[in-house]
């Protein structure tokens, strides 16, 4: 995929803000607690390797990714800290992880037994680092009974494993009603009752838990995800317990400016028709870049002023109404600040009837990433 350096459009990533968010989260944690920075999905669209490198300098203790391929890319880029693959990796690829000191998530007895057999057959000497996943109510992956978990604890004592962690994931930590959260927390306690010796990393807190439930959790590690990138995990549902600085901005420049006459229409389906003469700018950003097609009627910022998105967003371009004639090359902010005005990723998500996670992770590969700090 081409990173388009020759169009004046940047996804701007503020690494100082990223570090500030990590520091603010750390201030909320008990002394000695550790942070695993979640950099899966290209660091939520921000660029995995540059973001991880900045976070390593900021002192995070490790990283979480979704795929073994992502973990290998981090190792290849020089990242030496713990790297945990949160998804399930096929057993046949586990030797690659063992060779590079990459930690894998395990959620079944069958997987552990299959790897034991594979390690013996292939003569693998390097122990595989594993984190045992517990399904306390997310219903996704993990051991579902304390009995199976207890057997897993016995299996990971084998020489082919290095038992590094235990974790679960809360399904409703970003909601005001804590009933289901408390049910999951109690279920986690049931699992932990069979543990005779805790591994180095016990992590149950995601971004939402870190913002609103951290003091009720007995664990030594937090997985910091979307809050690290300056976005509220609940969207607009619950106010953050500490301030977050937005990390990601999307900035472009007008490629075409014209006067639209009354009665003339704009974009596919002719869904917008001018009621009077007005100035219109074409911007070189579209839904192929991750800006949602359904944003007609929303706005961008030009010179600190809200400028309405006219018609449907196209694959590569979009049109906005200007308050007056502006020259080609005028800056337009789709996410971020312009003078005293701001559009957050959550603002975009709310208008698009989705979540801020989807907007960030959907930022396209052809957007040129520009890093500050």
Curated annotation (Swiss-Prot):
Q: What class of enzyme is it?
A: isomerase
Cofactor(s) needed for function: pyridoxal 5'-phosphate
Q: Which reaction does it catalyse?
A: L-alanine = D-alanine
Positions bearing N6-(pyridoxal phosphate)lysine: 40
- Positions of transmembrane segments: none
Instruction: Give any Gene Ontology cellular component.
Output: cytosol
Please give the Pfam families that the UniProt record associates with this protein: Ala_racemase_C (PF00842), Ala_racemase_N (PF01168)
- Where on the tree of life does the source sit, at the highest rank? Bacteria
Might you name a Gene Ontology BP term for this protein?
D-alanine biosynthetic process
The yes or no answer to whether the keyword Chaperone is present is no
Q: Which residues bind substrate?
A: 140, 315
Q: Where is the active site?
A: 40 (proton acceptor), 268 (proton acceptor)
Give each disulfide bond as a residue pair. Answer: none
Question: Per UniProt, which keywords does this protein have?
Answer: Isomerase, Pyridoxal phosphate
Q: Which GO terms describe its molecular function?
A: alanine racemase activity; pyridoxal phosphate binding
> For this protein, what is the EC number?
5.1.1.1
Named in its record, the pathway it takes part in is:
Amino-acid biosynthesis; D-alanine biosynthesis; D-alanine from L-alanine: step 1/1
Task: Return the Gene3D superfamilies for the record.
Answer: Alanine racemase (3.20.20.10), Lyase, Ornithine Decarboxylase, Chain A, domain 1 (2.40.37.10)
Matching NCBIfam families: alr
Q: Which family does it belong to?
A: Belongs to the alanine racemase family.
Main role?
Catalyzes the interconversion of L-alanine and D-alanine. May also act on other amino acids.
**PANTHER family on file:** ALANINE RACEMASE, ALANINE RACEMASE, CATABOLIC-RELATED
- Protein name, as recorded: Alanine racemase
């Amino acid at each position: 995929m081409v990173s388009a350096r020759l169009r004046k459009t940047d996804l701007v990533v503020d690494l100082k803000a990223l570090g500030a968010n990590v520091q603010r989260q750390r201030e909320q944690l008990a002394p000695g607690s550790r942070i695993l920075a979640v950099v899966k999905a290209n660091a939520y669209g921000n660029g995995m390797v540059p973001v991880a490198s900045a976070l390593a300098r900021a002192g995070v203790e490790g990283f979480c990714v979704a795929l073994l391929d992502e973990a290998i890319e981090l190792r290849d880029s020089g990242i030496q800290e713990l790297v945990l693959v949160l998804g399930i990796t096929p057993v046949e690829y586990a030797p690659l992880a063992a060779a590079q000191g990459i930690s894998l998530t395990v959620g079944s007895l069958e997987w552990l037994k299959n790897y034991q057999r594979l390690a013996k057959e292939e003569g693998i000497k390097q122990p595989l680092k594993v984190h045992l996943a517990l399904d306390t109510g997310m219903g996704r992956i993990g051991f579902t009974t304390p009995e199976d978990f207890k057997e897993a604890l016995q299996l990971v004592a084998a020489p082919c494993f290095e038992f590094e962690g235990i974790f679960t994931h809360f399904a409703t930590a970003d909601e005001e009603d804590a009933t289901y959260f408390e049910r999951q927390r109690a279920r986690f306690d049931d699992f932990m009752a069979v543990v005779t010796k805790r591994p180095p990393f016990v992590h149950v807190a995601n971004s939402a838990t870190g913002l609103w439930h951290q003091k009720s959790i007995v664990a030594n590690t937090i997985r910091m995800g979307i809050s690290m990138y300056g976005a509220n995990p609940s969207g607009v549902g619950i106010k953050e317990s500490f301030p977050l600085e937005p990390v990601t901005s999307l900035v472009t420049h007008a490629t075409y400016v014209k006067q639209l006459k009354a009665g003339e229409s704009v974009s596919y389906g002719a869904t917008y028709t001018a009621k009077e003469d007005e100035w219109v700018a074409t911007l070189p950003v579209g839904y192929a870049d991750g800006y949602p097609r359904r944003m007609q009627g929303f706005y961008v910022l030009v010179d600190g002023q809200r400028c309405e998105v006219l018609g449907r967003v196209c694959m590569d371009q979009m049109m906005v109404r200007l308050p007056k004639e502006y020259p080609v090359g005028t800056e337009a902010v789709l996410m971020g600040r312009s003078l005293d005005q701001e559009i957050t990723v959550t603002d975009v998500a709310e208008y698009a009837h989705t979540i801020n996670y989807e907007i960030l992770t959907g930022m396209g590969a052809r957007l040129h990433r520009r890093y500050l700090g």
